[in-house]
Regions:
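Glycan-recognition and catalytic cores of secretory/periplasmic carbohydrate-active enzymes
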Residues: 1-169
Length: 169
């Protein structure tokens, strides 16, 4: 056995390789290169098409299946959606400036999303998609990039509060 002194883990431990964060850069307010405009347009069209199909065929469901044009919930109960897709898409709705769709998603989270569900949720998926989605939406609504939705301190606090509610469970 190796003898480890009682105070071995006290204080800061130096890293073996010095690590420096890169300097902060502002988010570009316009495409960096001319071909970026075409790519940005293609991304917007693809997202709007996918999001529109989800809203039409599976609104509120956790997952959307485009081939069958149907949705499912991860708990396999229609009455217990957690809204994985809605919350996961919030940051994209904000960045693309899709205000009406953003409002629909925000209102669904306000009116329908409940943590009081019976069943077992995947901790990884819940953390990255729901908790991550709420936290990124909170940060983006506090200080959105230029050309996206207008900042909303109220919405930022709302999403942060919902994230805290989930994290406390």
């Amino acid at each position: 056995p190796v003898d480890i002194p009682d105070n071995f883990y006290d204080g800061e431990r130096p890293t073996t390789v010095p690590f420096q964060l890169p300097p902060a850069r502002k988010i570009p307010t316009h495409p960096i290169q001319e071909q970026d405009k075409e790519k940005l347009h293609a991304i917007r069209v693809a997202f709007q098409s996918s999001w529109g199909a989800y809203k039409l065929n599976a609104w509120g469901m956790d997952e959307y299946h485009p081939l069958s044009k149907s949705g499912t919930n991860l708990l396999l109960k229609d009455e217990s959606p957690v809204g994985f897709t809605i919350v996961d898409a919030l940051d994209t709705l904000i960045i693309l400036g899709m205000e009406e769709d953003y409002m629909d998603a925000r209102n669904w989270i306000r009116d329908e999303l409940s943590w009081d569900v019976d069943g077992r949720l995947n901790v990884f998926e819940t953390t990255i998609r729901i908790l991550g989605g709420l936290l990124s939406a909170s940060a983006l609504m506090l200080d959105p990039p230029a050309g996206t939705l207008r900042a909303s301190h109220e919405d930022s606090i709302f999403f942060l509060t919902r994230a805290q509610e989930l994290a406390a469970r």
